[in-house]
Amino acid sequence: MRAYLLGKVLFPSFPTRLCARQVSDEKSCMQFSIQRSTLPSAESHPEEKLYRRLDVTTWLRHLNQNGQVEEEYKLRKAIFFGGIDPSIRGEVWPFLLHYYSYDSTSQEREAWRLQKRTHYHDVQQRRLSMSPEEHSDFWRKVQFTVDKDVVRTDRSNQFFRGDNNPNVEIMRRILLNYAVFNPDMGYCQGMSDLVAPLLTEIQDESDTFWCFVGLMENTIFISSPRDDDMERQLMYLRELLRLMLPDFHQHLMALGEDGLQLLFCHRWILLCFKREFPDTDALRMWEACWAHYQTDYFHLFLCVAIIVLYGEDVTDQQLATDQMLLHFSNLSMHMNGELVLRKARSLLYQFRLLPRIPCSLHDLCKLCGPGMWDSRYIPAVECSGEHPDSRCCPYGGTSTPLPSSPAPSCSPSRGAKSRDIFTFRKQS
């Protein structure tokens, strides 16, 4: 995972001052503080606070007499805004993680569980029946790292606390079996941080395994540390920052390639904010992302929200790349998760108000299906002009070219042409 965890390992506590150079002169130190403990209602999503946490009573209202989920879209919307009561997470999460289909009956789900439990045991048997040569290779590539990770994952959690805790061994088996089930992915450092909360809430080995499979295979929220996956996420995030926080993006541009790598947020994406917020807040963020309400990329709006709320010092003091990494690393466990969630929902709402979006962000709404712009004006796509392998925009984007940088267009323009439309409108 390169040095993604460097800030967390080296700087576990939040300092009151960050020094630009290791010198004794007090004037060489820059002062920092955590601000924005509240969010004005004018900056909130208009439907904020209209939804309560999904409790058992509300959940049962969404189930018909056969146990099928009715009004799935409304359910996901309620989860997006209100979250899920911890007492029913083990029942609801399998739906969000594509283990159960929403239209399955209670009887069908029980039969499915039995079928998948048999499949899981078959996967485990494949691992246990490896030849000595296969096992040696597996130990070197997978098991050695898994064994190191599981013993230090969430050990403060009562569910995993103590020596010889059987739940730690269950987590270990799930991770080893997943590496056999999906050898192309294998095991990546940090997966234990994702499995641990699933096992804590679901508390069944086979069900947890298949929910983890759904998490890894069916949600864009998860990004492996492999370069192509990570770079795609970072490209979208850079474009969102350019659109919504132009001053911060300009600062990144001034820092050059190092700044544009966005090293400070790699851990956010790889570990799904689990190292940045207490479990209570992090799991609420997971649920909001899993709800897939209006976008499959809500985690990127969470990233932008963190920068909006806690990144002002970066531009005010013109922090260098390493200082920026230190600044955001030291915010770990000191940020207001509920505030970040509310701001992210507001950012998504304002993104949907744009009549034109750059083609670089076209895929942010490509897979979400109904909901991103349901019953609303569908925005026109503006070509960024950055398609070296094509004379025309592959997304059919139009452009309002600047004299110095003409961009090709392949279809008539729709919607407003003003480039000012990309200035993020602030609510006040």
Label each PLM-derived region with a short phrase.
Residues 67, 83, 96, 100-104, ...:
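Eukaryotic basic, amphipathic alpha-helical target segments in cytosolic regions
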Residues 172-180, 192-200, 210-217, 239, ...:
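Contiguous, well-ordered alpha-helical segments that form the cores/surfaces of helical PPI scaffolds
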Residues 84, 142, 163, 167, ...:
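Secondary-structure capping and boundary motifs in well-ordered enzyme cores
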Residues 109, 166-169, 189-190, 210-211, ...:
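Short sequence/structural elements of tandem HEAT/ARM alpha-solenoid repeats
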Residues 76, 117, 147, 168-175, ...:
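Hydrophobic core segments within long, regular secondary-structure runs in both alpha-
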Residues 136, 157-164, 175-182, 195, ...:
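Active-site-adjacent structural elements in folded domains
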Residues 1-182, 199-202, 313-314, 365-428:
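N-terminal transition regions in large eukaryotic proteins
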Residues 40-41, 45-53, 132, 207-265, ...:
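Extended, Lys/Glu/Leu-rich amphipathic alpha-helical scaffolds
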